[in-house]
């Protein structure tokens, strides 16, 4: 039995109906769970002797509003965690979708893996995903006065405001963005024998 098959069987046995979907692609397993089961599943993944995912390596937010070749018809925001079992030497990706696209809220994993602290803060800062139960959920990389969440696909590339140092006021000031959007149309120039190809 292959290593992924052993992990898949252990996940199905330990989690039962909590497994919403289990996807195998490129030699990795992705476990999809519902937000209501997320915290309980995380504890089982850590504590069950047949699984023993001792480490959370990473957690990131994802905006699926424009995913793949067309419009995404599922829930918009997800948190994706990368887990590692040192005991069994295997990895697992866990994906959970926030049930509300307008105000995405998911349970915090801080009580399961305390190393998730800054990862959840980053997902909050960039995507606006609120992690319920997080002890210090505030921006981590953008400025305190930053408006919006810059990794959302509907966030304008130029942003809303720009900041600069004003020598007259001797301080940093914020002002509306002065960049005018423009359309750039690429041109393709074809030359005979370009690159030595006929």
UniProtKB/Swiss-Prot annotation:
EC numbers for this chain: 7.1.1.-
Keyword Cell inner membrane recorded: yes
Cited HAMAP family: NDH1_NuoC (MF_01357)
Oligomeric and partner information: NDH-1 is composed of 14 different subunits. Subunits NuoB, C, D, E, F, and G constitute the peripheral sector of the complex.
Signal peptide as annotated in the record: none
Major location category of this protein: membrane
InterPro entries xrefs: NADH_DH_suC (IPR010218), NADH_quin_OxRdtase_su_C/D-like (IPR037232), NADH_UbQ_OxRdtase_30kDa_su (IPR001268), NADH_UbQ_OxRdtase_CS (IPR020396)
Gene field: nuoC
Family assignment from sequence similarity: Belongs to the complex I 30 kDa subunit family.
Protein name, UniProt field: NADH-quinone oxidoreductase subunit C
Compartmental location: Cell inner membrane
Membrane topology: Peripheral membrane protein
Keywords: Cell inner membrane, Cell membrane, Membrane, NAD, Quinone, Translocase, Transport, Ubiquinone
Organism: Cupriavidus necator (strain ATCC 17699 / DSM 428 / KCTC 22496 / NCIMB 10442 / H16 / Stanier 337)
EC class of the enzyme, as a word: translocase
PROSITE patterns, A to Z: COMPLEX1_30K
Task of the protein: NDH-1 shuttles electrons from NADH, via FMN and iron-sulfur (Fe-S) centers, to quinones in the respiratory chain. The immediate electron acceptor for the enzyme in this species is believed to be ubiquinone. Couples the redox reaction to proton translocation (for every two electrons transferred, four hydrogen ions are translocated across the cytoplasmic membrane), and thus conserves the redox energy in a proton gradient.
Gene Ontology annotations for the cellular component aspect, listed alphabetically: plasma membrane
Pfam families: Complex1_30kDa
GO MF terms held by the record: NADH dehydrogenase (ubiquinone) activity; NADH:ubiquinone reductase (non-electrogenic) activity; quinone binding
Reactions catalysed, as given in the entry: a quinone + NADH + 5 H(+)(in) = a quinol + NAD(+) + 4 H(+)(out)
Oxidoreductase in keyword set: no
């Amino acid at each position: 039995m292959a290593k992924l098959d052993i992990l898949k069987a252990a996940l199905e046995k330990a989690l039962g109906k909590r497994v919403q979907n289990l996807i195998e692609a490129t030699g990795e397993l992705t476990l999809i769970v519902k937000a209501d089961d997320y915290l309980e599943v995380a504890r089982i993944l850590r504590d069950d002797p047949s699984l023993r995912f001792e480490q959370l390596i990473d957690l990131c937010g994802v905006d699926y509003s424009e995913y793949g070749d067309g419009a995404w018809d599922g829930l918009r925001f997800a948190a994706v965690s990368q887990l590692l079992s040192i005991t069994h030497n295997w990895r697992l990706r866990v994906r959970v979708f926030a049930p509300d696209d307008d105000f995405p809220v998911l349970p915090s994993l801080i009580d399961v893996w305390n190393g998730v602290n800054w990862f959840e803060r980053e997902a909050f800062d960039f995507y606006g995903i609120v992690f319920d139960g997080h002890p210090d959920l505030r921006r981590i990389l953008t400025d305190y006065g930053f408006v919006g969440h810059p990794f959302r696909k509907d966030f304008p590339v130029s942003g809303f405001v720009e900041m600069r140092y004003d020598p007259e006021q001797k301080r940093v000031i914020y002002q509306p963005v002065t960049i005018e959007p423009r359309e750039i149309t690429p041109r393709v120039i074809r030359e005979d024998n370009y690159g030595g190809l006929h």
